[in-house]
C-alpha cells in the first residue's frame, strides 16, 4: 500500500531562476486548460494543494510541491517533487503571453535534470486534438534515457461503458486511466492505489 506521508507547497515560478534546487526526482503534470490537473493532483496527494481556476488559461505559474511517499509493503519511504505546469491550448490567452509561457515551459522541461516522469493528462472524450498530439511529440523529443512519458486519461466517468472499454483496449501505451472518482470501478480499471504504485515505479526506476 502506498501512503502519502506529507505533501506541501514549495513555490511558484515563472522563470528558471525562481525554481527550487534540483535535489530530488520530480514528476511533471501537464495538460490542456480544464483537463482536470488540479483535481488529479489533489486526489493523488490526498490534500487540497493545487488550485482550480474558474477561468481557463488564467494559471500562469509553474507550481512546485514536495511529497513524501511510503511504500508499506516494501518498507520504503522516499521524497519527490510534483510540478504542476500551466495549462496550454486556450485560445483566449494573448499570443505574446502564450509565447512567453511556452518558452518557459519547454525551457524548464529541457534543462531540469531532476525531472524523471512526464504525466500528460488527456481528456478521454477528446483523444485526437492536435494540441495534445503536438505536446506529446514535443515531450518525447525532449526525453533523455532516464526519463519516461505517460499518458493519463481524465474525464473517464463521462464516457459510456462501451466507450470506456474501447479506450481501455485501444489507447496507445503506456497510459493510465484516472478512475479515482469513478463510483462503479471494475477490477480491470486502475484504482488510486494502482495509479500511485505505477507512478512510484516510474520514479524509482531512474532515481536522481
Curated annotation (Swiss-Prot):
A cellular-component GO term for this protein: cytosol
Endpoints of the signal sequence: none
GO biological process, one term: division septum assembly
Keyword Nucleotidyltransferase tagged: no
Needed co-factor(s): Mg(2+)
Superkingdom of origin: Bacteria
PROSITE patterns, per the entry: G_ENGB
Keyword Membrane found: no
A molecular function (GO) term: GTP binding
UniProt KW keywords: Cell cycle, Cell division, GTP-binding, Magnesium, Metal-binding, Nucleotide-binding, Septation
UniProt binding sites for Mg(2+): 38, 59
Domain (EngB-type G) ranges: 23-205
CDD domains: YihA_EngB
Binding site for GTP: 31-38, 57-61, 84-87, 154-157, 182-184
SUPFAM superfamilies per the UniProt record, alphabetical: P-loop containing nucleoside triphosphate hydrolases
Job description of the protein: Necessary for normal cell division and for the maintenance of normal septation.
Family: Belongs to the TRAFAC class TrmE-Era-EngA-EngB-Septin-like GTPase superfamily. EngB GTPase family.
PANTHER family named in the record: ENGB-TYPE G DOMAIN-CONTAINING PROTEIN, MSS1/TRME-RELATED GTP-BINDING PROTEIN
Protein name: Probable GTP-binding protein EngB
Organism: Helicobacter pylori (strain J99 / ATCC 700824) (Campylobacter pylori J99)
Lineage: Bacteria, Pseudomonadati, Campylobacterota, Epsilonproteobacteria, Campylobacterales
Gene: engB
